[in-house]
């Protein structure tokens, strides 16, 4: 007999235990002790109101474990639960697979909905407006055809979101028709009753569980501090893939201004060369068009200054800049244009025009404020820098971020909600079996102060499934002879695994040099090389890798984590260097200086734990199921030569380790 707790909810054992609801429904379900332990702890945290950090090894089934806690609260009617993920893949897994599976076995019903950012939804009123103005809004081949395809889709779609659209429209076309906060007539709109965005919002209001991504969660947290919101009220937060939240918070609590973004914004208002844009049709808009031309000219001068500064000085400083490092000839021009659009909004009799003008004025106002903020460097505790990218180094980004995002996250998240559960396969930099101490580094980075921790190890048999090879005789990675020696070692291990390998780097420059040295040899061995940065995006590289035998993928940062290749396609992961962050990045430099000022040793309190967590992520690419087997190879001899090296080995699951000398292999 299965006992229910009524308004107390549904306990973890009743759902996931050996004789629970899931096991009764699916005979092939294996009740895992680690999953059950995690589910109980999540349930306890949410019932008793404390924060919890859980490191759940690969194969634990952590989504079922935290969903058990969420369902318990939903059935007990204790409040709405927000589940946040970093990747779309995990969102889809939750909404399309895991949650429906549990809805199937839980007699007391609960509802779950996926939350998308407002810009993912079509606005029918703006679609009509764009259709009327299309000859002047769109200039490139195919854009008007895309608009027609969107209009046809709008008649049949139930969802009205970009992911439901069968074509991939250009950013210009979608921006002209997407739902926007400052460009919404609300209940006054003739389409309000059938509005895709508001329909989705109403379903979120009634859902027990909302699934969102980290970017949407932090947008909501930032807006709530200003008295607004993009999500309905929720009472509990579960953050999966939580190791990414520091980086997401950097973006949301910092500044990001792109040269392309400014030019694109101005072009959408009026492109002087093509005579297209929102202001192109109105003979009364000549003054505003002149202001757009002036903004274009000022932007060219401004970014030419930035580019010259970077070439002469900035590159040596890693891009870090001082206040007023270039003259501000742009923000006052943006202000003039903003005031011009505000004036036009007041004078026009066309309500649709009015909303468009007001929205652009808001965007210009935000840009103007951020530009002044960046140049004056008004925020204490932030670092400001310039990034220059692209083949001709013409993509310019102005960036700022807090040196310590912890206080920001603490204030907006941990102080606001009684129970926040954070989970990932890589949160702790301590050894297996260690409890809270290993989590203190992560907790300190994200402002998590009063919390409990759980390390739920993997159910996989790593001692049987993995062999770790360490090249103990290779030169130090900073030695000039390292790349040549590393290439010879890479050849050995690729022959041993027949390709089917990830080779993980910490820099593009070393990746490119290694690829150039090995390209012909790989061709001779009939192994196909996929090198990141050669034109294919990450998703296409992965699809290609999985479908081809004897494939070798060279990857940097984005391939160390969040990549899932189960089965024989991936049998070898080669880690070229221990993944210490490059210390010449302004943000890393600033954090190192801050720690020195606090009297700490930045290597042991920041650089080493960061590298250990990333090393765990790289190691974790190999074993994704209980039948996977293979090797992990470390070419960085510091892991056996330096006293700190043993901390890397202690942090990964226990497996067979072999230190190889040049003669041994």
Task: Label each region the model flagged.
Residues 80-89, 422-423, 499-511, 633-635:
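Conserved RecA-like ASCE P-loop NTPase motor core of nucleic-acid helicases/translocases
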Residues 175-210, 219-228, 343-474, 481-488, ...:
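A contiguous, basic/glycine-rich beta-loop/short-helix subdomain that forms a polymer-engagement track
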Residues 459-460, 471-481, 533-639:
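Conserved RecA-like P-loop NTPase helicase motor core
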Residues 66, 72, 92, 97-100, ...:
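Signature of the SF2 helicase/ATPase Hel1-core->accessory helical subdomain module
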Residues 2-25, 30, 77-208, 269, ...:
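A substrate-engagement module of RecA-like helicase motors
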Residues 506-533:
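Conserved helicase motor "Helicase C" RecA-like lobe of SF1/SF2 P-loop NTPases
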Residues 28-46:
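N-terminal pre-P-loop "Q-motif" helix
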Residues 48-69:
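Walker A/P-loop
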